[in-house]
Amino acid sequence: MKSPLPWLKRRLSGRADSEHAQNLIRIIITTLFISYLGWRYQHTHGDTLMATWLILVGELLVSLGLMVAILLRPQVSHTRRLIGMLLDYTCTGAIMAIQGEPASPLYAVCMWVTIGNGLRYGSNYLRAATAMGSLCFLGAILISPYWKANPYLSWGLLLGLIAVPLYFDSLLRAMTRAVREARHANQAKSRFLANMSHEFRTPLNGLSGMTEVLATTRLDAEQKECLNTIQASARSLLSLVEEVLDISAIEAGKIRIDRRDFSLREMIGSVNLILQPQARGRRLEYGTQVADDVPDLLKGDTAHLRQVLLNLVGNAVKFTEHGHVLLRVTRVSGSAEDAVRLRFDVEDTGIGVPMDMRPRLFEAFEQADVGLSRRYEGTGLGTTIAKGLVEAMGGSIGFKENQPSGSVFWFELPMAIGEPLKSSTVRVPTGALVDAPEELESSNIIAFSNPFLRHRARVRSMRMLVADDHEANRMVLQRLLEKAGHKVLCVNGAEQVLDAMAEEDYDAVIVDLHMPGMNGLDMLKQLRVMQASGMRYTPVVVLSADVTPEAIRACEQAGARAFLAKPVVAAKLLDTLADLAVSTRQLATPATTVQVATSFEGVLDSSVLDELAALGMGEEFERQFVRQCLDDAQNCVGDIERDGTCSDWEQLRESAHALRGVASNLGLAQVASSGGELMRMADWQLQAEWRLRLSTLREQLKAGKDALDARVQGVKDGECSPRSNE
């Protein structure tokens, strides 16, 4: 039988106030006074003792009832608060009136209840408690012979019961005002930092985007070295901007915790891949130790845990010049069977932390001294971000000295034991058919290491509309999109977007969120109204330097198809466009499309492979491309069957997403559409229909394979290639 204590703790830990603590103390004090009076009158009997006992028992029973009510309805209840206050004062006043001198210590209880209500619930409750307590004590003075016989003491205590809480009320209001002003100042600082981070992203967008375009051109060794330096500097600046945004989110309490199953050792391995080269460059010994009793499969926020480790271990590498850096993971004793508490220790032999710095170690924008801030780059936010993330995940963090030199940063986190992870098939991306060396760039084989050429091979050309009020941002997007094979029209405002869409159809729109006049959100809302009136649906991608959770949520609610952060990352942009191409492909009916056979109409969109053939890659390449894509599609169908058998609906959606991407590469419209439907289905729908959907997918894939075989045979015979019409 499990103990009810963990359930009680979970039930009460998330409450918005501390009413349960006040009620628990009431129960304890009532019990203590029952014991006190029993000891005081152990040899005395009488009606007053019986009345006192009945009052105390009644208060105890009502208090227990209030505790049950709190457990059943943990929400804030003003009615329960008032009932508790009335219970305290009426019972205290009645006992003081009945018992007289032996009950005089209850005056302290009256004062405690009054001050406690003020501290817990605010000034209004403090004044109400003062009035209730004064009236109850006044009743005891007027009834009890003891208090009547000591008028100076009685009236003096009554004045104290009024004056002390009222004076305390003035102090409480001053403290509340000071806290509110400090909070407003902190919020203003956070807004300023977030705004500055937003402004940094705009020039970074031009810098990062243009260097990605430049990296795809022919460069000699010296130019490549210069370009790598520029890109590394841009990434470093972006990481500083991200740290400022992280600390702003932590201070605003907007950190979202996303708990998922993950492999602890794989996650630590990904951290090692990033930090080991840095440690090797500084000639440091770098190692990790995970205790044997630490489970590998856990459920927790792996992204934030990884960020904490990168901050702490990265700091250890940065501040260590000789010796070693060691990450240890151990299991804290006393962990439950279905949960575990892990301790992470990051040990180094670096410069350590000076004594005068330790109290401020986890404060924002702090480094050990000015000399260090010049010597070691950074904002001084790493430990602050780590502390905020660890506490948001329900853990604790600290520091201790590592003798004879260095430091040890540690943190503990509670985690649930994860479900066994299925071994997933490693899918080779369709684009990775050829790892072409430089000498093959001039041949008729696509260099698939180039993301733009890979995108052009996978995604048909689309008509894009781009809106941004900064000319540099428009130029970056235009260069990136044109290099990826798309046709682009750039405008500088949201009004021009609506005008352009009223005149012509576009496959997708990329719009900045914040622009003068009509902003991106207003444009999205207006566009949805126009589309509801009969205009063709066009997906909209929001590209913005404002990456706050509120901005992202507002864009989703307004109908944005995707949200991308500035500075634009070419790989993410191209992946998003590939996803959009699936939803818009069925609307495209180019006049140059050559149908393979009328029996395959609706099964195969020949324009996709026609565009690939138009790149001049050769017939052999197209056959290899089709063969690899079909193999990938068969693997995806097998994954869907495995996921359905295991009732892993989330992974089934991921497998359907992969199938949709592969099918869209081939122009298999039916398969891509069915994959998209599976992605959007709820768990209960998948549970009921996945076998039927899988059977349909297999039939559609077989029909698509027949259509592709016919096309490939036609290409071989010279019947279907666009070049045959030249």
UniProtKB/Swiss-Prot annotation:
Top-rank taxon: Bacteria
Primary location class: membrane
E.C. code: 2.7.13.3
Residue ranges annotated for the Response regulatory domain, each copy included: 463-581
Gene Ontology cellular component list: plasma membrane
Transmembrane parts of this sequence: 23-40, 52-72, 95-115, 128-148, 152-172
Post-translational modification summary for this protein: Autophosphorylated. Activation may require a sequential transfer of a phosphate group from a His in the primary transmitter domain, to an Asp in the receiver domain and to a His in the secondary transmitter domain.
Keyword flag Transcription regulation: yes
Protein name as annotated: Sensory/regulatory protein RpfC
Source organism of the structure: Xanthomonas campestris pv. campestris (strain ATCC 33913 / DSM 3586 / NCPPB 528 / LMG 568 / P 25)
